[in-house]
Swiss-Prot record:
Localization per record: Secreted; Secreted, Cell wall
Disulfide bonds: 34-82, 42-75, 43-61, 83-97
Primary site of residence: secreted
Protein name, as recorded: Class I hydrophobin 3
The organism of origin for this protein: Passalora fulva
Subunit structure of this chain's protein: Self-assembles to form functional amyloid fibrils called rodlets. Self-assembly into fibrillar rodlets occurs spontaneously at hydrophobic:hydrophilic interfaces and the rodlets further associate laterally to form amphipathic monolayers.
Conditions for induction: Expression is increased during sporulation. Expression is up-regulated by carbon starvation, but down-regulated by nitrogen starvation.
Record bears the keyword Signal: yes
Length: 102
């Protein structure tokens, strides 16, 4: 019985992950919004360790829905940024990201 339940659970989890819900933010991005053309991202650089303006380059960041999968649904405090995105929805890895203050 547990085998059948686990077989049925895998597609359900894959379906839930494949359809991101833009209205339900989790982790450090709750209530955070970015300007048009930018998206919430979780970065490997803490904003306290970034340059004088508090910016990091987008290459060290992942979009929120991808980063939550790799970080077990939790972006560490101080690692949430607004990063400029390309027209196809991917991050512009050469542009600077701006920290989101909690």
């Amino acid at each position: 019985m547990q085998f059948i339940a686990s077989i049925l659970a895998v597609p359900a989890v894959a379906y839930a992950v494949a359809i991101p819900d833009d209205n339900s933010a989790t982790g450090a991005s709750k209530g955070s919004t970015c300007a048009t053309g930018a998206q919430v991202a979780c970065c490997t650089t803490n904003s306290s360790n970034s340059d004088l303006l508090g910016n990091v380059v987008g290459g060290s960041c992942l979009l929120d829905n991808l980063s939550l999968l790799s970080l077990n649904s939790n972006c560490p405090a101080g690692n949430t940024f607004c990063c400029p995105s390309n027209s196809d929805g991917t991050l512009n890895i050469n542009a600077q990201c701006i920290p989101i203050s909690a």
